[in-house]
């Protein structure tokens, strides 16, 4: 159902109304790419066979190339993406490819995101030169910068955002938009803040009903980080990430039944955890 909906809006491009989005936009295309990757995992889990899963993977590969060809552009001097064909002003949604694992233009995109044209004390402007900011794109961006492996940069700006918006003068939740509604929109963006931690810092990616990949991004100043009582994949477990020396990490997973698994890996690498 989700894949069908994303495919529909991929071709029809739902109008955003508040800012121009063109006939096809970067955000919807990137979301559809990630949905195809997830559909491939799901097809395998449901026993649909390798042919179905491989079809989704091939479609994702083709779409990734087309995203680069169609949206890849130099905008305001940055090697990043045009949000839609003909767009020549930086938009916060250039972060979405990073969040979805598309990193061909990560260097220029990260530079643009944290440039004075987009970054403010409240996070990202929706469009360079405007006064509007949507927490949604800021939270996606921080998660995407972690996913791209720029841990120190992501942590620096996560701390800045958190200090201003969680500890400074603020409403006590992530907001839909500003200046629209004067920050009164309580929205699902609060959940996106949590996903910076689970999917950004810890790099959790579901690949099955009882399995996931883990790509931990432990900041250099931290010796360890942990998630306790993760209730997912049909289980209740703790995750502990510890530094084991230069470039080396150790992952300790402990289930609520006391079963423990230990994994050793190099920084930036990915492991698969199976809870079956």
Name each region found by the language model.
Residues 49, 55, 62, 70, ...:
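Beta-rich accessory regions
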Residues 19, 79-82, 222, 248:
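A broad structural signal for short, well-ordered beta-strand segments within beta-sheet-rich domains
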Residues 9-18:
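A short, charged helix-loop
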Residues 1-4, 8, 23-54, 58-61, ...:
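Active-site core of glycosidic bond-cleaving carbohydrate-active enzymes
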Residues 65:
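Short, well-ordered surface patches within globular domains
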